[in-house]
Regions:
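N-terminal type II signal-anchor transmembrane helix
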Residues: 1-48, 76
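Sec-dependent signal peptide cleavage junction
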Residues: 41, 172, 176-178
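Flexible beta-edge/linker motif
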Residues: 54-165, 177-200, 208-241, 259-282
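Short, surface-exposed beta-strand-loop junctions and turns on beta-sheet-rich folds
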Residues: 72-73, 202-203, 246-247, 285
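Flexible, surface-exposed loop regions and adjacent strand-edge segments
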Residues: 127, 168-172, 246-252
Length: 286
């Protein structure tokens, strides 16, 4: 009888031991690099792109670092040429383990460093391209059940992004409601620029953000409701051009160039058709 019990214990122990060995191996750098290359190869085949990763590092329990991520796609008009969809110098993801067991996500750090991107034809509505020095998010309150996100801190630094809207987008008849609610305690943007172009370059808007701070934001994506407690934009600039409109002397509403722009807003609220805010500071040169 004891012999049978021993064999039963051994049979139960073998898969447990093998699982523990596998877990330990996943924290060995050579195994990590081998595994990530296999995953990148599989993703490349499924997505029809070339995805490569230079190096990966996983520290117990879920502190992940990835270096040298490149995503290439064949050019849709020139044979033999590829477009770089993304080139990311480093990705850091530090996620707490225990909250995952209760369907919650707590992210101590999710950051992307030295990013260059070009969505090419992946997004029909627009082409987004540019570079980002740092994108950092800390979130200790993502609840997958209640569809709520609490962002403790978000930072964007050294970004230069352009968005070119398309005029050939078919109507989307498959839209589904989005019920997520997002709270943002603190948002910081430094040394960044954003350019928006409408189809056929009929309008261009360029925004320069040397320093922008926003606090206590709330965004209900289902109701399209957006609130901010405070927003401060310091020493920025704004260019607005109706490209095909002739220029006129004096204040030209079709061609506006604001510099040394300082803007302070309290209690911003927007939920169509209602817009409310307290304008604390507004100063600029034109």
């Amino acid at each position: 009888m004891k012999k049978y019990i021993r064999w039963v214990v051994i049979a139960i122990a073998i898969p447990i031991v093998l699982f523990l060995i596998l877990v330990v191996l996943l924290y060995c750098p050579p195994v990590q690099n081998w595994a990530v290359k296999r995953v990148a190869s599989y993703a490349s085949q499924k997505m029809g792109m070339e995805i490569t990763v230079d190096r990966v590092r996983l520290v117990f329990p879920l502190d992940l670092g990835v270096e040298g991520v490149r995503v290439l796609q064949a050019n849709d008009s020139i044979a033999g040429q590829t477009d770089t969809i993304a080139n990311v110098g480093r990705i850091v993801a530090n996620v707490q383990l225990m909250p995952l067991l209760s369907n919650k996500v707590e992210v101590d750090e999710l950051s992307l460093h030295d990013v260059r991107m070009n969505t090419a034809n992946l997004v029909h509505e627009a082409r987004i391209k540019g570079k980002v020095g740092l994108l950092l998010v800390q979130s200790r309150g993502v609840d997958l059940n209640s569809k709520t996100i609490r962002v403790n801190q978000a930072q964007l630094k050294d970004a230069n992004i352009s968005v070119e809207l398309s005029d050939t987008v078919p109507p989307d008849t498959t839209k589904t409601p989005v019920y997520w609610k997002i709270k943002v305690d603190k948002l910081q943007i430094e040394h960044s620029k954003a350019l928006l172009r409408t189809p056929r370059d009929s309008m261009a808007v360029l925004v320069d953000l040397p320093k922008l701070d926003a606090k206590n934001g709330y965004f209900d994506l289902y109701k399209n409701l957006y609130r901010l407690e405070t927003l401060d934009w310091q020493n920025g600039s704004l260019n607005y051009d109706q490209t095909y409109k002739p220029r006129t002397d004096g204040l030209d509403p079709n061609h506006i160039h604001l510099t040394e722009l300082n803007l302070g807003i309290d209690s911003f609220y927007f939920c169509q058709p209602e817009l409310k805010m307290n304008l604390r500071v507004c100063a600029f040169k034109e």
